[in-house]
C-alpha cells in the first residue's frame, strides 16, 4: 500500500513534522513543500499543482492558508477514489468534484474558543491559523456530491472543540451520516464504492 512506503507531510510545524527523521531512517520517502525540505533535505519537494504518480496513487499538492508554507493533497487511486486531505489551514480556497473521502481540519468551535480566550487558555493567533467548525461545514456543503463515502474531521484541538458534538453537527447540517473524528488508533477504510 502507498502509505507503507511514502509519507506526505503538510508543513514544518513540529506537531506535523517531528516524525520525519524516523520516517526517513526507516526508508520511507517523505514528500512535502520546499519549506520542509529546507529543514529535512532528504524530503522530496512536491511542486504545487503538479500530479505525481506514486505506486498506484496519483497525488497533487495544493497550497493551503497557514502561517508557514503548507500543502493539502488530492490523492486518487482506482480502489479508493478521490481523497482530499487538508489540515493546518484557516481556509480551503478550492472547489472539488466527485470526491469519495474528505480528511479535513476542524480545529476549533467558536463558542469553545471564545470561552478559552476569555479564560486565557488559548491565544487568538492560534484560531487565525486553523479552521473553525462552521468554516469546515461550509466547505463540505460547497463540495458535497453524491459520490461522497466518508468524512473524517482531523486536527481537532483538545480544548477548543467537543469532537462528538462536532461530528453530530456535521451529520445534522449535511444530512450525511458517515462522519468520524481522528483520534489515536483510528483506522478508516477508504473504498471507492459504498461499504
Say what each PLM segment does.
Residues 24-30, 81-83, 178:
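Short active-site oxyanion
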Residues 43, 59, 179-181:
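Generic structural signal for residues in well-ordered beta-strands
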Residues 1-3, 18, 46-101, 188-195:
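Core dinuclear metal-dependent hydrolase active-site scaffold
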Residues 96-184:
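Cap/insert and terminal regions of metallo-dependent hydrolase folds
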Residues 14, 32-39, 47-49, 89-91, ...:
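Short, polar loop motifs at secondary-structure junctions
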Residues 11-18, 37-39, 67-69, 91-94, ...:
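Active-site environment of divalent metal-dependent phosphoester hydrolases
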Residues 18-27, 42-43, 161-168:
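Metal-dependent catalytic neighborhoods of phosphoester/phosphodiester hydrolases
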Residues 1-35:
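Active-site metal-binding motif and surrounding structural segment of the metallo-beta-lactamase
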Amino acid at each position: 500500500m502507498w502509505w507503507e512506503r511514502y509519507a506526505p507531510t503538510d508543513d514544518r510545524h513540529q506537531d506535523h513534522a517531528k516524525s520525519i527523521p524516523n520516517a526517513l531512517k526507516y526508508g520511507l520517502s517523505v514528500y512535502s513543500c520546499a519549506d520542509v525540505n529546507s529543514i529535512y533535505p532528504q524530503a522530496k519537494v512536491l511542486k504545487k499543482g503538479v500530479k505525481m504518480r506514486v505506486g498506484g496513487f496519483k497525488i497533487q499538492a495544493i497550497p493551503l492558508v497557514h502561517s508557514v508554507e503548507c500543502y493539502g493533497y488530492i490523492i486518487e487511486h482506482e480502489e479508493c477514489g478521490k481523497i482530499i486531505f487538508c489540515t493546518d489551514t484557516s481556509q480551503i480556497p478550492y472547489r472539488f468534484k466527485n470526491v469519495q473521502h474528505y480528511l479535513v481540519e476542524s480545529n476549533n468551535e467558536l463558542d469553545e474558543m471564545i470561552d478559552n480566550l476569555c479564560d486565557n487558555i488559548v491565544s487568538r493567533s492560534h484560531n487565525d491559523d486553523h479552521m473553525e467548525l462552521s468554516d469546515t461545514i461550509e466547505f463540505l456543503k460547497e463540495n458535497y456530491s453524491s459520490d461522497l463515502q466518508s468524512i473524517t474531521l482531523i486536527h481537532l484541538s483538545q480544548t477548543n472543540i467537543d469532537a462528538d458534538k462536532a461530528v453530530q453537527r456535521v451529520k445534522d447540517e449535511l444530512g450525511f451520516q458517515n462522519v468520524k473524528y481522528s483520534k489515536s488508533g483510528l483506522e478508516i477504510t477508504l473504498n471507492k464504492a459504498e461499504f
